């Protein structure tokens, strides 16, 4: 089995355009992946096209780790969210093909089932909205994002609305310097925040 085509599909949406990847093989099996990056979808699509030509087409799609390494190490410069998003989209599609080839869900190829149910959370910016989502619609928790200086007041309002039997999360989208993010996390701790997503940008070590 060999990869014969890698094609991207750009789906226009309101807030963010979605970029999907379709990998086709000579046996007719196809796999799908998703590689959306807000406002950078055309750059990711171009990167996918380059990766496909250099490292994917003609390869056995079941050699997923080999293809991943070739995509990652193909040039002198590597990394960055454009490159890694492109790799991710293709990688997902290859795993999709593998699952279809072996006739098992992909999670079985990754080690099997860990749990038989999942929590489901959504986004809220006010206490009233959070209460409705958690206690009337049944979500297990809510995630919020506030600029520096406003987060603690928002967390207090939301925690009082949903109580401590529901989970609370924060996402800063990597927009703050490390020192300010540290302040935010200290302020969030008293409200039982379960996780603090992207406190700094991916390039900040």
Region roles according to the model:
Residues 16, 43, 47, 59-62, ...:
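Conserved active-site and cofactor/substrate-binding residues in soluble primary-metabolism enzymes
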Residues 50, 89, 96-97, 108, ...:
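Alpha-helical scaffold segments in soluble metabolic enzymes
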Residues 91-123:
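Glycine-rich, aromatic-flanked loop segments that form ligand/cofactor-binding clefts
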Residues 1-32, 36-37:
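Structured beta-strand/loop patches that form or line metal/cofactor-binding pockets in enzymes
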Residues 26-101:
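Metal- or metallocofactor-binding catalytic centers and their adjacent structured scaffolds
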Residues 111-205:
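Metal-dependent enolase-superfamily TIM-barrel catalytic cores that perform enediolate-based chemistry
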Residues 3, 28, 52, 90, ...:
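Conserved, mostly hydrophobic/aromatic
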Residues 5, 11-13, 58, 92, ...:
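Generic structural "secondary-structure junction" signal
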């Amino acid at each position: 089995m060999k990869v014969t085509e890698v094609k991207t599909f750009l789906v226009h949406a309101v807030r963010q355009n979605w970029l999907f990847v379709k990998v086709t093989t000579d046996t007719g099996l196809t796999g799908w992946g998703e590689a959306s990056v807000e406002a950078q979808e055309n750059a990711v699509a171009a990167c996918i096209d380059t990766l496909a030509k250099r490292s994917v087409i003609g390869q056995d799609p079941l050699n997923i780790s080999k293809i991943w390494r070739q995509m990652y190490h193909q040039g002198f410069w590597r990394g960055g969210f454009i490159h890694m998003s492109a790799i991710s989209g293709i990688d997902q599609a290859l795993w999709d093909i593998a699952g279809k080839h072996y006739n098992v869900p992909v999670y079985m190829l990754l080690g099997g089932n860990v749990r038989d149910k999942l929590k489901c959370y959504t986004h809220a910016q006010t206490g009233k909205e959070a209460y409705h989502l958690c206690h009337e619609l049944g979500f297990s928790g809510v995630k919020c994002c506030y600029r520096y200086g406003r987060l603690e007041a928002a967390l207090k309002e939301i925690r009082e609305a949903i109580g401590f039997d529901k989970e609370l999360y924060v996402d800063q989208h990597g927009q703050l310097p490390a020192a300010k993010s540290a302040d935010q996390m200290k302020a969030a701790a008293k409200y039982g925040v379960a996780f603090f997503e992207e406190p700094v940008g991916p390039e900040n070590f």
